[in-house]
Amino acid sequence: MRSHYCGDVNKSHVGQEVTLVGWVNRSRDLGGVVFLDLRDREGLIQVVYDPDLPEVFNVASTLRAEFCVQVKGLVRARPDSQVNGQMKTGEIEVLGQALTIINAADPLPLSMDNYQNNSEEQRLKYRYLDLRRPEMAQRLIFRAKVTSSVRRFLDSNGFLDIETPILTKATPEGARDYLVPSRTYKGQFFALPQSPQLFKQLLMMSGFDRYYQIVKCFRDEDLRADRQPEFTQIDIETSFMSSEQVMAKTEEMMRGLFLEMLNVDLGEFPRMTYNEAMRRFGSDKPDLRNPLELVDIADLLKEVEFAVFSGPANDEEGRVAALRIPGGAALSRKQIDDYTKFVGIYGAKGLAWMKINDLSLGLEGIQSPVLKFLNESIVNEIVSRTAAQTGDIILFGADQATVVAESMGALRLKAGEDFNLLQGEWRPLWVVDFPMFEKINGNFHAVHHPFTAPRGVTAAELEANPANRVSDAYDMVLNGCELGGGSVRIHNQEMQSAVFRILGITDEEAKEKFGFLLEALRYGTPPHAGLAFGLDRIIMLMTGASSIRDVMAFPKTTTAACPLTNAPGFANPQQLAELGIAVVEKAVKTED
């Protein structure tokens, strides 16, 4: 039905007859000549119909937006005065000689030109129209090219694309599972995988030493701008490779991808330990474009008569950190109050501050409600450590170390945006040496997952003293976003059982939930390591989209619903009966 895509026609085709198909982007009747902008996935082209062919002209005059049509005509160069530099095809146009309406379009339920006027609900309900917009189409085309590039790289490096099951067994991986009832095993359920983690480890045990898969994963969790109930991972696993080798290989892949797709050289990725990242930036995925850093000052404040500072300064689990904002002395009291409310979202009880109005005047040139509690030598040392200058403000976080990191880390990001401080377009890094465990309500939890190997300890040593142990784990971070994370895996039964026990999983419970894994670990398991990248997030960053919903063809809403298909929906009662499922209505409590 076509000889060319609309966006592919150029000056080299002048004088040729072409056949095009697509949708009417816009139609204009200007003084007896109809100008038609025809659109397909590759772009727009202008088609001109004049009254010399009355039958064709009359049909062209009836066209409205989103009619699906076939056009036949002659490519000609536009006059210099009519060249449109904003269009890929702006140097040429097609003189229409034939026109077929393939399918008419009703009046549209959403705006194609001013899509900002469409609600998110409208865009998802009529997604097939929303995806016709060039911006959306180009993102999906870009995504297809990215996955093709990734496959080429992994294929050429000896990785095998192997599928793993979608219907599997529920395992504790941090989020709720989507459950699928079994008809043949009444009362029993499959789970949709949160990741192929255990199956890819089993593939390593099976001898397939380089595996990859671009795979759907599922998590029933509260959604944010960068989360969806179903999402896509670039999943990778290797045998007989160290964490350094895995990082080197996947860094090579990511650098090649950015060079191919964006002509961006990311350069060599720096390494940073988890502890350094939390200390300097208050985050395990720091945005290095932001020059602001947290500075520890607790050692200066242990003796001050101000409990807000001295309390955390003398607490082993406390922290006092300072954050200098260049030019921040211009902040009004209301703006400082807004920052105080902002850190309160993250558990901070307040936000002390110090304005450096004129450094040459000593204490006289410094304004702060806490200045009366600090002697001159302490103030001078705070100014020195933070490298504060006249016109700056220093903000203070004092609380439990976790609260200070989270609240001041978030404030660092906000201030960096507010003061336009971000430097450079792309700043990647590896974050390494994560803690093996974290304590929540007195119980140990895996920081990554229960199959991550510790670094440099035996099973007995780990179980005897699990606190402060470091895992052989690594995250790739770009511009404050985690692109992917991975680790060396546990490859012997003794260590895996020890980790389960530390996590409060009894030997009996471990056998019930992970018996197949523990059994497999008995038969010559090779050392193995891997990682998984979030494909949707990578595409979001590379295209500049504000949400992963804008780089997925048919995403869900923030309430995990699909307005297009009205999913989820009620099941047929007969189906429920076959599955042995009864729907229990939530009881409504009434007062007597």
Curated annotation (Swiss-Prot):
Pfam families: GAD, tRNA-synt_2, tRNA_anti-codon
Renumbered residue ranges of the record's region Aspartate: 197-200
Binding-site residues for ATP, renumbered to this chain: 219-221, 228, 482, 534-537
EC numbers for this chain: 6.1.1.12
A GO CC term attached to the entry: cytoplasm
The entry's keywords: Aminoacyl-tRNA synthetase, ATP-binding, Cytoplasm, Ligase, Nucleotide-binding, Protein biosynthesis
PROSITE patterns: AA_TRNA_LIGASE_II (PS50862)
UniProt-annotated location(s): Cytoplasm
Major site of localization recorded for this protein: cytoplasm
Highest taxon of source: Bacteria
Signal peptide (UniProt feature, chain positions): none
GO terms under biological process: aspartyl-tRNA aminoacylation
Binding site for L-aspartate: 173, 219, 448, 489
Catalyzed reaction equations: tRNA(Asp) + L-aspartate + ATP = L-aspartyl-tRNA(Asp) + AMP + diphosphate
Statement: the UniProt record of this protein carries the keyword Aminoacyl-tRNA synthetase: yes
GO molecular function, one term: ATP binding
SUPFAM superfamilies noted in UniProt: Class II aaRS and biotin synthetases (SSF55681), GAD domain-like (SSF55261), Nucleic acid-binding proteins (SSF50249)
NCBIfam families assigned: aspS_bact (TIGR00459), PRK00476.1 (NF001750)
Function field: Catalyzes the attachment of L-aspartate to tRNA(Asp) in a two-step reaction: L-aspartate is first activated by ATP to form Asp-AMP and then transferred to the acceptor end of tRNA(Asp).
Quaternary structure note: Homodimer.
Family according to the record: Belongs to the class-II aminoacyl-tRNA synthetase family. Type 1 subfamily.
Protein name: Aspartate--tRNA ligase
Organism for this UniProt entry: Shewanella baltica (strain OS195)
